Amino acid sequence: MRGRVSPLMLLLGILVLASVSATQAKSPYRKTENPCAQRCLQSCQQEPDDLKQKACESRCTKLEYDPRCVYDTGATNQRHPPGERTRGRQPGDYDDDRRQPRREEGGRWGPAEPREREREEDWRQPREDWRRPSHQQPRKIRPEGREGEQEWGTPGSEVREETSRNNPFYFPSRRFSTRYGNQNGRIRVLQRFDQRSKQFQNLQNHRIVQIEARPNTLVLPKHADADNILVIQQGQATVTVANGNNRKSFNLDEGHALRIPSGFISYILNRHDNQNLRVAKISMPVNTPGQFEDFFPASSRDQSSYLQGFSRNTLEAAFNAEFNEIRRVLLEENAGGEQEERGQRRRSTRSSDNEGVIVKVSKEHVQELTKHAKSVSKKGSEEEDITNPINLRDGEPDLSNNFGRLFEVKPDKKNPQLQDLDMMLTCVEIKEGALMLPHFNSKAMVIVVVNKGTGNLELVAVRKEQQQRGRREQEWEEEEEDEEEEGSNREVRRYTARLKEGDVFIMPAAHPVAINASSELHLLGFGINAENNHRIFLAGDKDNVIDQIEKQAKDLAFPGSGEQVEKLIKNQRESHFVSARPQSQSPSSPEKEDQEEENQGGKGPLLSILKAFN
């Protein structure tokens, strides 16, 4: 009896097997070569309900080509979307970096309504006149993937390299967002520096703005709750600045700068018939740190007039006129009669593409707006007025040779426009194939805008050694909060970036920097905390701080003797700007030099900093 199976038990077993087979037939296990999606599909098999299981599998299928679904590095036969080379997300990768641009509407810049659209718009350069010539188009850069690479040197002196995507000091042009824009031009604002990295808290109240305008256009009058310094990067502009008692107009060309104090009304005219106007501006808000607002007296598609914010009684009392007249003249609402015809004629000249804060103007308007404008002399104005323009190329350059030159305007009594702001303006021109030698600023923190050309940046920093490589940027910033912990190991990091027109990078005080020009490179610098700042070079015939170190100290600090260090320094006969091509090597073989270095051993952190530039 014990060996016999009950017919009832046998029937129940058959029913269970049939049920399992039916379940597997309805929901077959789908295979995928993406390990991330594979694990998701496996988890779906635990769902008891068929509908929930199918919904789970549908979600997992979408992960197969999702860039957030990281492929395992050890997986074979990885599948990628056609034509795309996929890699894991690295520190510094932002969500907006993965967005794809939408189709441009009407071939013009749109208003800055949703911020996402602004970011997507910055992925591409504008069409027609705004597009660079084909020979100036920036190349698509593939990440070098050298993060964490151990460089040459003695144990404990390795140099870690961070490329453009992981470089907190580098702000590509796509990080600008468009505040106002139409087919006549656009005004863009760079993201806040302190939002990128907490080490830029001193720059919290400094914002970079770019203005681009087509020929014969006008940026409408406005004022802002921020002090501004603008610099003409390209083209010819007539800038008018006015307060309650005075008005000044200046004809500005490339290299001219002008301060617009907070609350002063200003408007910018591109008076050239064929050339686009480009202006770089640094804004320092006076109300809320890091935030500023523009106030327009006239309404446009992008911005309403601040006069509309006042009540009817206030406007009638302020202008001593009836509200209907105020509305017709200033607000263009419900106009009638002769005023309506005049408004229609004005609106006919301002088509839908011409509505906005940048408008097209006639040649007659250009002549009237430039009639009383003053030109800027090479020596600048002798009057001590903060609204007088500055000529960045005034006089002889501060540094100059066959490979480049540098002009600098310092915050002193000669330049009251900069003195109370404690700022300096720097203009650097590096010839193609030249190198601006490694150097640093003793006190100033410099915001650099790439005005023209292409090049490569190398910036050296000393950071707390990071045990786990490849963290997300948020975790990396949290790690920076503990940078000043005593006793923690420090490592030298090299931050690199490929520079192109419109990019911005930061030169913190005391951080060594070298700049290599792959084409003629023009840079514009806004220096913060510039009073008593000194530019200190680490190589070259003149202004070389290492050459000032005593021979005995050199002998203790470097692997070679003091005499060898001094002899090496004298090999470079140029100063400040040199050829980027390395000079001929000494007769001794590299193997012999490495052996001598190993025998000597590293003697100090200065050697590690110098190694970062190799």
Curated annotation (Swiss-Prot):
Q: InterPro entries, from UniProt?
A: Cupin_1, RmlC-like_jellyroll, RmlC_Cupin_sf, Seed_Storage-Functional
Signal peptide residues are 1-25
Annotated glycan sites? 516
Ranges annotated as biased composition (Basic and acidic residues): 81-132, 464-474
Which stretches make up the Cupin type-1 domain? 169-327, 390-566
Any Pfam family: Cupin_1
Task: Kindly indicate whether the keyword Signal belongs to this entry.
Answer: yes
| UniProt superkingdom | Eukaryota
Report residue spans for region: Disordered: 72-177, 334-356, 372-397, 464-491, 572-614
Q: Which CDD domains match?
A: cupin_7S_vicilin-like_C (cd02245), cupin_7S_vicilin-like_N (cd02244)
Q: List compositional bias (Acidic residues) regions by residue number.
A: 475-486
Instruction: Give the UniProt keywords, A-Z.
Output: Allergen, Glycoprotein, Signal
Question: So what family is this one in?
Answer: Belongs to the 7S seed storage protein family.
The name on file for this protein is Allergen Ara h 1, clone P17
Q: Which organism is it from?
A: Arachis hypogaea (Peanut)
